[in-house]
């Protein structure tokens, strides 16, 4: 029997995201990894480095999500306010994590660019589970309060992804209500609307597994997705639908689970082997 379904909101913090100076890959990565463990992402929110607006976003998330995940704003500068604002919103004090402080001393002891404000990073919500940062200095964390599960991850994409996969996903895996498997059939020479017309009747009645066409920059894909208690069961559900899609689309199919025509051609050349 599957577990309770948890709704998640991702709050990405950073004025640079709103200005378009940085692409929000963190939200994409978090969503992708959560989908693999059956945790539903319902909302993406982006907010600048403003404590009042961030507090409003957290209050909104508290009213509609079971899991709140923030990315960004954990660094040592004056505009890194995610921990302070989030902890205040849940009435949790920030306390020094001595293990992280010791680790930070070790990390920066030979640095010429050390400043005392670096140690603000080791102030964390009391009683939280600490996520060590293997790619930087700002730790993340998770805590539970008022029936909500709160995770805070760093903003730099490399740091966020490493912490997400090594710490956050293992922490959240217990909450997933099943396993999700998704595969794509890549096609060239036929448009999204034509593919939709071919499969319209089937897609209207399919729920699990499901399929949907998507237009990409130079081609299209048909995404087939299934959810089950185990990955093996989900794979079994997806397999016949994938075969059906490939059979119906025939000569338009150039690959499965590839990113582009170029990648498919390269794989073909390597398999020959040819250059």
Where do the PLM segments sit?
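Glycine-rich phosphate/diphosphate-binding loop of Rossmann-like nucleotide-binding domains
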Residues: 2-45, 232-236
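Conserved hydrophobic helix-helix packing surfaces used for dimerization/oligomerization
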Residues: 8-10, 150, 274-275
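Glycine-rich beta-strand-to-loop/alpha-helix junction loops that act as flexible
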Residues: 13-15, 70-78, 154, 228
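Short beta->alpha junction loops
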Residues: 43-53
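Proline/glycine-rich low-complexity loops and linkers
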Residues: 53-56, 63, 80-175
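Accessory alpha-helical/coil subdomains and C-terminal extensions
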Residues: 144-218, 223-225, 233-238
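Short amphipathic alpha-helices in soluble, non-transmembrane regions
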Residues: 236-247
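Short alpha-helical segments enriched in small residues
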Residues: 245-275
């Amino acid at each position: 029997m599957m577990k309770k379904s948890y709704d998640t909101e991702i709050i990405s913090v950073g004025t640079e995201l709103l200005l378009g100076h940085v692409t929000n890959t963190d939200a994409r990565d978090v969503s992708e990894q959560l989908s693999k463990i059956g945790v539903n992402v319902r909302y993406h929110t982006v907010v600048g480095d403003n404590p009042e607006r961030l507090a409003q976003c957290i209050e909104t998330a508290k009213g509609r999500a079971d899991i709140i995940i923030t990315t960004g704003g954990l660094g040592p500068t004056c505009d890194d306010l995610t921990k302070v604002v989030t902890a205040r919103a849940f009435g949790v004090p920030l306390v020094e994590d001595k293990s992280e402080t010791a680790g930070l001393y070790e990390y920066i002891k030979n640095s010429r660019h050390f400043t005392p404000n670096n140690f603000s990073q080791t102030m964390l919500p009391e009683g939280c589970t600490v996520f060590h940062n293997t790619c930087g200095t700002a730790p993340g964390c998770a805590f539970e309060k008022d029936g909500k599960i709160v995770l805070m991850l760093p903003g730099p994409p490399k740091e966020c992804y490493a912490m997400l996969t090594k710490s956050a996903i293992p922490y959240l895996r217990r909450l997933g209500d099943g396993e999700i498997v998704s595969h794509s059939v890549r096609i060239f020479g036929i448009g999204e609307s034509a593919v939709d017309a071919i499969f319209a009747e089937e897609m209207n009645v399919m729920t699990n597994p499901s399929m949907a066409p998507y237009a990409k920059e130079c081609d299209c894909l048909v995404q087939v997705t299934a959810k089950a208690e185990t990955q093996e069961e989900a794979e079994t559900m997806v397999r016949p639908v994938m075969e059906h899609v490939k059979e119906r689309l025939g000569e338009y199919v150039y690959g499965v689970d590839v990113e582009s025509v170029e990648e498919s051609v390269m794989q073909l050349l390597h398999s020959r082997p040819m250059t």
